[in-house]
């Protein structure tokens, strides 16, 4: 599982955070001792607090953010040192799954599929809006009742292109959930991301040992900053997709969170905090529990606070958040991201 900061939150009052719900979901089909969490050093205590079932060796701590390709590559080398023929599920920790039995069935079928081939598998979801925060999958031939060959894989397109994809009816969202054999993904990395593969393969003798953390702390920051989608999935010729309806939503996007949340009579969503809204509609407000939001005259806005950052922007301009993050990193460093 890939853990991010906001996954500590219980958005829907279930008593379990998004991270804990993801763990609960996967432990139904994967032994607890085989579950790993990859996260930043900053969140080590948080993960240990939320998932006491895991021991420290099951929590891989990145010394710095380097995007998903280095994260997944490191986990693959680590896993191969423990099990040279492991089959792997890579899952973000901010997903909501409403149809868990169908989802877990797809996971089990997917693991069986990648166990007998060198294919890289992703889950595809039929889109209901042009969303720039997801990758888009165009399918080619249907190889059996569950799997399709991927024709094109486009990582997080601009809004106009996303609109074209959705209107065509030929594209599916990439759910950001992948399955593969450990040797298949390492081979793909060696072919398509040789710089990254060379850097991490240099630690082959220390993975799974007490020296692993020192090696990662020294070498991980120099890994190329590239996503698994752009670095491998867009370029590989052995990518397949399993299509399904799992009641899936990526709560890493505010649009998804708004769609799934209970609304007041003016279509406003308030989560965690309390609010007084006047002459306002179609907004989503996410503030800490001890905060009161008093809002007058806003329509279609996102107002969200996390630690030391307050974000206020048009809800339909969510695709600009990537720009805000990049600008903040360039101008202010990572203290506010």
Describe each PLM feature range.
Residues 11-92, 98-104, 108, 316:
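Conserved N-terminal catalytic core of the sugar/cofactor nucleotidyltransferase
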């Amino acid at each position: 599982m890939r853990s991010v900061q906001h996954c500590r939150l219980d958005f829907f009052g279930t008593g379990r955070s998004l991270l804990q719900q993801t763990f609960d979901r996967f432990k139904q089909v994967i032994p607890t001792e085989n579950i790993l969490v990859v996260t930043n050093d900053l969140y080590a205590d948080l993960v240990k607090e939320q998932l006491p079932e895991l021991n420290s060796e099951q929590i891989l701590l990145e010394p710095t953010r380097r995007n998903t390709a280095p994260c997944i590559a490191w986990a693959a080398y680590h896993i191969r040192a423990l099990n040279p023929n492991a089959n792997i599920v890579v899952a973000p920790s901010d997903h909501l799954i409403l149809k868990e039995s169908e989802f877990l069935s797809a996971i089990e079928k997917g693991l069986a599929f990648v166990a007998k081939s060198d294919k890289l598998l992703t889950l595809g979801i039929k889109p209901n809006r042009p969303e720039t925060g997801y990758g888009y999958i165009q399918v080619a031939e249907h190889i059996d009742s569950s799997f399709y060959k991927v024709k094109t894989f486009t990582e997080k397109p601009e809004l106009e292109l996303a609109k074209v994809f959705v209107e065509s009816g030929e594209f599916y969202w990439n759910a950001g959930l992948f399955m593969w054999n450990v040797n298949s993904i390492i081979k793909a990395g060696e072919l398509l991301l040789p710089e990254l593969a060379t850097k991490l393969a240099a630690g082959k003798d220390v993975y799974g040992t007490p020296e692993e953390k020192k090696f990662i702390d020294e070498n991980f920051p120099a890994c190329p900053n590239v996503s698994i989608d752009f670095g491998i999935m867009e370029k590989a010729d052995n990518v397949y997709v399993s299509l399904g309806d799992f009641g899936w939503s990526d709560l890493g996007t505010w649009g998804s969170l708004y769609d799934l949340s209970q609304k007041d009579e003016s279509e406003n969503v308030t989560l965690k905090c309390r609010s007084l809204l006047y002459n306002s509609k179609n907004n989503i407000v996410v503030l800490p529990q001890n905060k009161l939001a008093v809002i007058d005259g806003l329509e279609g806005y996102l107002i969200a606070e996390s630690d030391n950052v307050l974000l206020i922007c048009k809800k339909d301009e969510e695709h600009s958040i990537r720009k805000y993050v990049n600008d903040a990193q360039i101008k202010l460093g990572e203290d506010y991201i």
